[in-house]
Amino acid sequence: SIYFYLYRLKGCHQIYNPAFMRLNDNIFRANDIRGIAYEDLTQEVVFALGQALGSESIKRNQNNFIIGRDGRISSPQLFAWLSEGVLSTGCNVIDIGIVPSPVFYHSTFNLNSSSGVVITGSHNPADYNGFKILFENRSTSSEEIQAIKQKIIEKDFISGKGKIHSTDIVESYINAIKNDVNLLHSLNISIDCGNGAAGVVAERVYKS
């Protein structure tokens, strides 16, 4: 692994106290960011990632940034650190809660932002987590992931004070499915979401 040692980001002492942070180069994958929660994805790293994403969002004239998450135990804490970083740039956070990735993608077409991130470890073991990032309804390329890393290394962040609010996007997602799918017959089904984020929306979708 290649590690970059960065001095504490100015103005972030209220979020964390270490004098420097360790940034594992291996968390920056081809199209997302992924690593072991609390080991690779530390408070300092995730906060700085939030600063980079918020700064990039504002640069693209997106003053609102959507954040969703999966059901992993580490996801609420990563959300807290990430959202604080985004807010510190003056970018607003739209919290859509625990949602599967398709609902997150739907949100970027139906809320006041086309950019955001879903916190998810995907198929990886329970101690992993990660970040799938969208800007302007597009998944980030490997070049964009590397640019985000460079922002963190250079501390190329905007400063400001954003606001956060929560919204339920699931109802909009349900309506989109209902308008697109017509069942010829009623169905009796059983669902096993395997502890995935779909568990919080599947019953609502099928009952509707």
In which residue ranges do the predicted regions lie?
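An N-terminal, well-structured beta->alpha segment
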Residues: 20-84, 88-89, 166-187
